[in-house]
């Protein structure tokens, strides 16, 4: 055997280090996009008044475009990860799981694209609508997808929760923010605003800790508690976005019925 065919340890270590750096870079970029999406929508709310949102569909489009585009794009990336994440032969269960993930993520991406159109065509006529759509809604819909894409592995056979160290605490706090937002979603409560402000702050903390004190990822995401954590996050994703999809379908049905009269 030629000596050139023997794997060199330093090459393997260098490749592993490169993969870790690439993964960290992807996480940091994801955090930045989340912060920009939320901050931009919130900034528009403070710049313009209610009449501007009600009369200007372009302003409504710009306000919802960033957070909902992030969600649509992220689900397409999750689809790509679940579909291309494993080149090894699969058994029937893993193959079925991969097809289920892929179909679900494509569906959710479509829902968010349709939601951009629906929210742009809505008049935002209620007094609370600009605040709700520009600040409350992004901080409600983004956390489940954020946790699924940052804290979990979707590779068949390695599916589970992967965060370690301080990031686990941050994930728990993000989940609590989501639950608070869910409880007070349709109420004019100060608690939903607290949650809407806390979530981007937690993302910022995570970005800084990942940049300067990275915790790394677990090499055993399939341990029992990690699988349970993944299932909990995934259930939140399915419930939240299925409900949104039903609302989108009902709204589209109303529009089509109105147009055909």
UniProtKB/Swiss-Prot annotation:
Coiled-coil intervals: none
Transmembrane segments: none
Name of the molecule in the record: UPF0328 protein ECU02_0020/ECU04_1700
Source organism (scientific name): Encephalitozoon cuniculi (strain GB-M1)
Residue spans of biased composition, Basic and acidic residues class: 11-20
Disordered: annotated span: 1-20
Family: Belongs to the UPF0328 family.
């Amino acid at each position: 055997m030629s000596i050139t065919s023997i794997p060199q340890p330093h090459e393997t270590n260098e490749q592993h280090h490169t993969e870790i750096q690439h993964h960290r870079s992807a996480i940091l970029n994801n955090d930045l996009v989340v912060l920009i999406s939320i901050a931009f929508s919130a900034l528009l709310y403070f710049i313009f008044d209610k009449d501007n949102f009600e009369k200007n569909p372009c302003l409504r489009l710009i306000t919802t475009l960033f957070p909902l585009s992030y969600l649509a794009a992220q689900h397409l990336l999750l689809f790509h990860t679940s579909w291309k994440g494993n080149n090894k032969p699969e058994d029937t269960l893993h193959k079925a799981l991969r097809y289920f993930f892929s179909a679900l993520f494509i569906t959710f991406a479509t829902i968010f694209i349709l939601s951009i159109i629906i929210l742009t065509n809505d008049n935002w006529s209620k007094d609370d609508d600009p605040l709700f759509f520009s600040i409350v809604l992004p901080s409600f819909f983004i956390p489940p997808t954020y946790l699924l894409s940052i804290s979990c592995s979707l590779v068949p056979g390695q599916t589970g929760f992967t965060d370690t160290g301080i990031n686990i605490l941050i994930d728990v706090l993000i989940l609590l923010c989501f639950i608070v937002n869910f409880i007070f979603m349709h109420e004019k409560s100060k608690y939903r605003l607290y949650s809407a402000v806390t979530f981007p702050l937690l993302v910022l903390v995570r970005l800084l800790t990942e940049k300067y004190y990275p915790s790394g990822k677990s090499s055993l995401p399939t341990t029992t508690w990690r699988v349970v954590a993944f299932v909990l996050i995934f259930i939140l994703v399915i419930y939240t976005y299925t409900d949104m999809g039903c609302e989108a379908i009902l709204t589209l049905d109303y529009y089509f019925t109105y147009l055909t009269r």
